[in-house]
Every structure is written in C-alpha cells, then in structure tokens.
Swiss-Prot record:
Functions as a chaperone protein. Is one of the most abundant endoplasmic reticulum (ER) proteins. Plays a role in the export of secreted proteins in the ER, the recognition of abnormally folded protein and their targeting to the ER associated-degradation (ERAD). Also serves as a cargo receptor for the export of transmembrane proteins. Plays a role in the assembly of the mitochondrial membrane respiratory chain NADH dehydrogenase (Complex I) by stimulating the translocation of NDUFS4 and NDUFB11 from the cytosol to the mitochondria via interaction with TOMM40. One of its GO terms (biological process) is intracellular protein transport. It comes from Mus musculus (Mouse). The chain crosses the membrane at residues 7-27, 44-64, 103-123. The record marks 164-165 as: Cleavage. Cleaved by CASP8 and other caspases. This is B-cell receptor-associated protein 31. A motif (Di-lysine motif) lies at residues 242-245. Ubiquitous.
Length: 245
C-alpha cells in the first residue's frame, strides 16, 4: 500500500474510533460539551471549516482516482493476451483488487467525515437543550415557590381583612393580588417553555439515537469489507505461491 493510501486508511481508523467513542452511552452530552468548549478544541475549530473543505476535496479526488483505476482494470480479457503473457491475468486481478480496496477506504473515509461532523453537532445541540431545560426547570420551581408564598400571604391578608376590615390597607391588598396574578402568568409561561424544551430535547435524543444506529451499521459494514479484503488477498496470494513452488 502506498504512502497516500496508508495515510487515508489511518485516517479512516481514527474516524471509526472517534465515532465509536462519541456513541458510548455512559458519557453524557454535557461532558462532551466541556471537551468541545476546551481551548484546544476551540483552536482546532477556528481552522476547522477550511480543513474540512480541503479534506473533502482530497477524499473526493481519491474516490475518483479509485473509480478510474477500477474502470481501467475492469475488463481484463480485452487487454491481456493470455497466450503470450499467461501471468498477466494475476497481475491485472491484483491491480483491480487494489483499486477496489482504495475505493472502499476513500469512500468510507468521506462518509464518516460527514457523519462525524453531524454527530458532534447533534451532541452539542443536545447538551445545550439539557442545560436550557435545567435552567427553565429551576426558574419554574422558583416561580412556583414564590407564587405559593404570595398565595399564602394573600390568604392571610384576606383573613386579616375579614377580622379587622377597618385596619387593613386596601391599596396593599390590591397590590398583592396583582403580584399574585403576575406570578401566575409567569409560572404558566415557564411551564409552556419547559414543555417546548422537553419536546426539542426528545427530538435531539431521537436524532442522536438514529445517528448511533447508523454508525453501528457502518462499523459492521466496514468489518464485513475487511473480511472480504482478507479473503480476496488470500485468494490472490494463493496462485502466486503455487506458481513459485
């Protein structure tokens, strides 16, 4: 394997490892968000878009080159004279096998690049939704406690007004009632926002689960291709060993 394809294969292995690492269930999105917000990652993200575009262009060129090689060595019978050169068939099969292997490596590297970028985006969105959900929940709890407190004070004021109507300041009572209504409205708004945030969070979790299932399917497909690669390599090496014997 040449240096460029060794580099692409190493990059593919790193992508598979990164996808599996991001799909680990016991690492919460909040922890990943802390990692994404670190100085080192932010420095990488600063130049990340340019690097991603350059990477995609390189991988697309490699895929095109692999397809060109496959088409070049696809029809062996029209290009090889078996009577004058009987060993050329094995040579062409070897070239075709390498071209197909390179296509798999470059294609999966390109696919996992988009998958990895999308997975990081979904994890960041899920962490943001979780944080906002907790903030809304705390606001709703504090508003609920304040509303209960003002309702108790309102009840006490009503009892005091019933017992000592002449001594009670009517203006303060009306102010408390208005504050109570305002707090009830705020509590209702916070509950609506909390319900909306929960729906967004469920949607993000479903998308993350779908991406995880997709990455697991890609990993299984990659393992299957590795097994086919090993079988093809063994079948190609077999005739060569027999010929040398």
């Amino acid at each position: 394997m040449s240096l460029q394809w060794t580099t692409v294969a190493t990059f593919l292995y790193a992508e598979v490892f990164a996808v599996l690492l991001l799909c680990i269930p016991f690492i919460s999105p909040k922890r990943w968000q802390k990692v994404f917000k670190s100085r080192l990652v932010e420095l990488v993200v600063t130049y990340g878009n340019t690097f991603f575009v350059v990477l995609i262009v390189i991988l697309v060129l490699l895929v095109i080159d692999a397809v060109r090689e496959i088409l070049k060595y696809d029809d062996v019978t029209e290009k090889v004279n078996l009577q004058n050169n009987p060993g050329a068939m094995e040579h062409f099969h070897m070239k075709l096998f390498r071209a197909q292997r390179n296509l798999y490596i470059a294609g999966f590297s390109l696919l996992l690049s988009f998958l990895l970028r999308r997975l990081v985006t979904l994890i960041s969105q899920q962490a943001t939704l979780l944080a906002s959900n907790e903030a809304f929940k705390k606001q709703a709890e504090s508003a609920s406690e304040a509303a209960k407190k003002y309702m108790e004070e309102n009840d006490q004021l009503k009892k005091g007004a019933a017992e000592d109507g002449d001594k009670l300041d009517i203006g303060n009572t009306e102010m408390k009632l208005e504050e109570n209504k305002s707090l009830k409205n705020d509590l209702r708004k916070l509950k609506d926002e909390l319900a909306s945030t929960k729906k967004k969070l469920e949607k993000a979790e479903n998308e993350a689960l779908a991406m995880q299932k997709q990455s697991e399917g890609l990993t299984k497909e990659y393992d299957r291709l590795l097994e086919e690669h090993a079988k093809l390599q063994a079948s190609v090496r077999g005739p060569s060993v027999k010929k040398e014997e």
